[in-house]
Amino acid sequence: MLRAARIADANAFPHSTMRCWRYVKQALLQAGAVSGYPSTNYACQAGAELTSRYGFVRLKIHDPYRAPVGSVLVYSGGGAGHVEIRTEHGFASDYRSAWACRYRLIGVYAKLSA
């Protein structure tokens, strides 16, 4: 999962392109954290798909700043929601930020075996 965090951070833009879930999917796939390209369309659906199809578990963490590096944070809000990966210096999806998303955190997900 550390590799996914590094890939996400390296591919992120300074500002949002409104494609957070696409960039997180690509980082997870390139890192080998998922066996295929996730099929859900909306960021708010990411947690359900990662747990049901790819062996991720939902962590009992409710503060995004306490999420382990490499974990996937899923938020509701803004219609489609938002998803980002915790990095060593903050958070990354289609953009990088030192601050977590302000939407309501749905869950923090990690693949414990990877």
Provide a role label for each language-model segment:
Residues 100-114:
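C-terminal partner/receptor-binding element of secreted or periplasmic proteins
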